[in-house]
């Protein structure tokens, strides 16, 4: 298993500076991670810096609350793709899910999938805020909407991925949709637990520490 190709090397803090973005880009190139995941304002710069590498550019949409309108999420997605994003991590409308407005949730995802024009879309369902049945339903809606991944967490809601949630998500979506675990994956042991549970992508700021077998102190 090529550990590095599981990792979206992530920096989503609002105070992220260009120097810090440069650091994660340099690290991603050195370790040949699958992608760097950055806020939309950094996408164009990251795409330019990574043009001569295999490392993809991932960004986030409707992040971290998922509470922006569907039209806004679609516009954000189109803008990100124009600026060079290869992959899109969107946040669902969590309140709509809890209301039982499942058509709204699915249509929200579908709009982003359409706007992404064939680029990979990962759907963040924020598992820490959901019960068992809501995790199942959100995963089902992700699959029905045609997204590529269902993803556990933003890392901004006070909790991250658990192996139990990853397994539940994978059992729900089956072989057609992949699972991304994010939030709280700080070391190789955490990484292995998520992969064993069914994750094929790991979102973490601790990519270097994971590769080196060390421990990180970040929540994402």
Swiss-Prot record:
Keywords: Cytoplasm, Lyase, Schiff base. One of its GO terms (biological process) is carbohydrate catabolic process. It catalyses: 2-deoxy-D-ribose 5-phosphate = D-glyceraldehyde 3-phosphate + acetaldehyde. It is found in: Cytoplasm. The active site is at residues 89, 151, 180. Pathway: Carbohydrate degradation; 2-deoxy-D-ribose 1-phosphate degradation; D-glyceraldehyde 3-phosphate and acetaldehyde from 2-deoxy-alpha-D-ribose 1-phosphate: step 2/2. Its main location: cytoplasm. The keyword Cytoplasm applies. GO terms for molecular function: deoxyribose-phosphate aldolase activity. The keyword Cytoplasm applies. GO terms for cellular component: cytoplasm. Belongs to the DeoC/FbaB aldolase family. DeoC type 1 subfamily. This is Deoxyribose-phosphate aldolase 1. It comes from Staphylococcus aureus (strain bovine RF122 / ET3-1).
């Amino acid at each position: 298993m090529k550990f590095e190709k599981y990792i979206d090397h992530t920096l989503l803090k609002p105070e992220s500076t260009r120097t810090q973005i440069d650091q994660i880009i340099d690290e991603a190139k050195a370790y040949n991670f699958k992608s760097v995941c950055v806020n939309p304002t950094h996408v164009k710069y990251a795409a330019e810096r990574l043009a001569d590498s295999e490392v993809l550019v991932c960004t986030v949409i409707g992040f971290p609350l998922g509470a922006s309108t569907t039209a806004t999420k679609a516009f954000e997605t189109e803008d990100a793709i124009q600026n060079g994003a290869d992959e899109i991590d969107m946040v669902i409308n969590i309140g709509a899910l809890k209301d039982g407005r499942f058509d709204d949730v699915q249509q929200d995802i579908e709009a982003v999938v359409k706007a992404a024009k064939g680029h990979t879309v990962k759907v963040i369902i924020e598992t820490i805020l959901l019960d068992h049945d809501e995790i199942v339903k959100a995963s089902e809606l992700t699959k029905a909407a045609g997204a590529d991944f269902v993803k556990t967490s933003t890392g901004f809601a006070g909790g991250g991925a658990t192996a139990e949630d990853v397994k539940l998500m994978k059992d729900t979506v089956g072989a057609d949709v992949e699972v991304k675990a994010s939030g709280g994956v700080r070391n190789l042991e955490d990484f292995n637990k998520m992969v064993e549970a069914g994750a094929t992508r790991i979102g973490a700021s601790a990519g270097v520490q994971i590769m080196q077998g060390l421990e990180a102190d970040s929540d994402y």
